Each structure stands twice: as C-alpha cells, then as structure tokens.
Amino acid sequence: KKNSILKKNQSWINATENNFKVDDYESLIPNADLVINLTPDKEHHNVVTTLQKLMKKNSYLGYSHGFNIVEFGEIIRKDITVIMVAPKCPGTEVREEYKRGFGVPTLIAVHNENDIHQKGLEIAKAWSFSIGSHRAGVLESSFIAEVKSDLMGEQTILCGMLQTASILCYEKLITNKHDPAYAAKLIQNGWETITESLKHGGITLMMDRLSNPSKIRAYKISEKIKKILTSLFQQHMNNIISGEFSSEMMKDWKNNDKKLLDWRKQTKDTSFEKAPIYIKKIPEQEYYDHGILMIAILKAGIELSFETMINSGIIAESAYYESLHELPLIANTIARKKLYEMNKVI
C-alpha cells in the first residue's frame, strides 16, 4: 500500500532489508509474470479484484491457500493461469525453515478452469523449489482437497486438539498438585519435542521413545480417545464438506471477527497462558516419560483426522500433510509463545 511505503512501516522495513523491491500495485503488477497473493483469506476478494485489473495477459496468479477459489467462488480471468503452493505450516515457519537451509512440506495444485496453456504445474513446481520445499517434500493435490483438508486439520489435530489438550493437561496437573511452572513447560515445550519424532519416523518412532509398559498405556488411552471423538470429528468434516463451516466463518468476517477475537481472548485468559516460567532444563526423554497422555492424544488425533478425511473422499496426500506432517511446525509456535502465538499466526 502507498501509505505503508510513505510511512516506511515494519513490513516495508522487512522487505527492503531482505532486498525485495517495494512499490505500489500500479507500478509492479502490470510487469509481473507471476503475482503471488499471500494476504489473509478475508482480504482475497478485494485484493484479487484489484490484481485482475492490472495483471498482464497470460500471466500467473499464485495462492498459498485455495479458500478464495473453492469456498468464496472467485472467478479469475480465463487468460490468467491460477496455481497454488501451500506450505503446510504458518508463514513464519516457512521463512525460518528456509533460513536454516531446509524447507517445509508443501502441496501444489493448478486450478483446472484457469490453466489455458497447461503450464501451471511446472510454474508451481518452480515456486515450491524456490522456498526450499523440495527438501522436505512436495506433493501434487487439488484446490478442493487442499482447502477441505486444511480446514479439517486446523479444526482438529493441528490446532483444536493441541489447544484443548494443552489447557486440559495443565489443569489436570495443577489439580494433582504438580508445580505450575514445571507443568506449563512440560506441555508448552513437550508438543514440540515429542512431535519432532514425527518428522523422522511418524507415529512409530514417537511411540518407540516410550518403554514397553508406557507404549501399551499410550495405545489404550489413544483408542479410548478415538472412540470418544469419532462422532465429533465426523461432524466437523461434514460441516466443512458441505460449506457450512466456511459460511459461518465468512459471516464472522463481516462482523469484524467478533467470534474469533472473543475466542482468542478466552484462550489468552486461561491459567495455562498465565502460568509462571520454569527456568530449569527438562531433559528430552523426560518429555516422553512424563507425557504419555500427550502422546496418546497425538496418536489418536493424527489417526482420526487422517481416517475421517480419507473416508470423506479427500486424497491421501492432502490428508497426510494435514494430519501428521504439519503438526511439528504448529507445535513450534506453541513452544515460542504458547497458544496465543499459535492463534495469531494461523
């Protein structure tokens, strides 16, 4: 925005310090071969409407999430090729993983109604390569599968369960007279430590960090959790497939995000968020040994999310990324600043 450029705000500083050319729409868009829209979903319609008036013929429009196309139903000029590169993590983690020489798992897709030259997939591959995702894994998906699986993953295992489990596990430990500071650190950093094993060996490796008796206990607990939550997960999936979930979310956008901000405030006011800081280091294995319930929750949530998505017709690539592969990167945000950070960056 011109106003941001004139004021040289933080986004301007970030861009210029990283050697990006900064200018307004009218100066940059008409000459661009590829225009990437990374604005929040609620801003997409206005942004894309403006972009289409300025984009040159036969150019490419890129999304990192297909909500605007699938749920809002945005119509794009037929000469514009529409592609998607959807890193399976918050945007902050895309940058951090790239800086350390790696990347994040990514889904790529082409909007079939906007691929007039049949070159969309090659451009999407090149874009995903440029952010380092080829080092972590790039799978071809579709706009619909990415959106439906993304919404399902975030509402269940990725955000919903991590948030609810953090609050409930903390309250249980406090009720049992454990040190509040230790309990908070065990949970806050425990998700990150435990899910790191998912990156390298999935649920099997995570479970292998436990003793045999603890494995059996975690397995039994996870099976109980799955039975309790199966109908709830299926209801979430039904609401997402039908479009009801997205419809309610867009209504909240028009109401200045009242529900979202109220929920975010409720989370910020929980005892877990306000817990004292534990200064001492917790050994890595201790997170596993004292986190059997957390491991059971992760196992149940991953399996149930994946199974529910597959049973609803979502392709396995999208279901896998949204149930397991993105989980460690979401856990990273909790480790930094607990649940409020996760809610803000998602």
UniProtKB/Swiss-Prot annotation:
Residue sites binding Mg(2+) 1 per the record: D150, E154
Family: Belongs to the ketol-acid reductoisomerase family.
Gene designation: ilvC
GO cellular component: cytosol
Domain KARI N-terminal Rossmann as annotated: residue spans: 1-141
PROSITE patterns noted in UniProt: KARI_C, KARI_N
Reaction it catalyzes: (2R)-2,3-dihydroxy-3-methylbutanoate + NADP(+) = (2S)-2-acetolactate + NADPH + H(+); (2R,3R)-2,3-dihydroxy-3-methylpentanoate + NADP(+) = (S)-2-ethyl-2-hydroxy-3-oxobutanoate + NADPH + H(+)
GO BP annotations listed: isoleucine biosynthetic process; L-valine biosynthetic process
Higher taxonomy: Bacteria, Pseudomonadati, Pseudomonadota, Gammaproteobacteria, Enterobacterales
Binding site for NADP(+): S11, D41, K42, E43, G91
Residues the record lists as binding Mg(2+) 2: D150, E322, E326
Cofactors: Mg(2+)
Binding note for cofactor: Binds 2 magnesium ions per subunit.
Domain KARI C-terminal knotted, first and last residues per copy: 142-286, 287-346
Pfam families per the UniProt record, alphabetical: KARI_C, KARI_N
Function (record text): Involved in the biosynthesis of branched-chain amino acids (BCAA). Catalyzes an alkyl-migration followed by a ketol-acid reduction of (S)-2-acetolactate (S2AL) to yield (R)-2,3-dihydroxy-isovalerate. In the isomerase reaction, S2AL is rearranged via a Mg-dependent methyl migration to produce 3-hydroxy-3-methyl-2-ketobutyrate (HMKB). In the reductase reaction, this 2-ketoacid undergoes a metal-dependent reduction by NADPH to yield (R)-2,3-dihydroxy-isovalerate.
Name under which the protein is recorded: Ketol-acid reductoisomerase (NADP(+))
SUPFAM superfamilies: 6-phosphogluconate dehydrogenase C-terminal domain-like, NAD(P)-binding Rossmann-fold domains
Catalytic residues (positions): H65
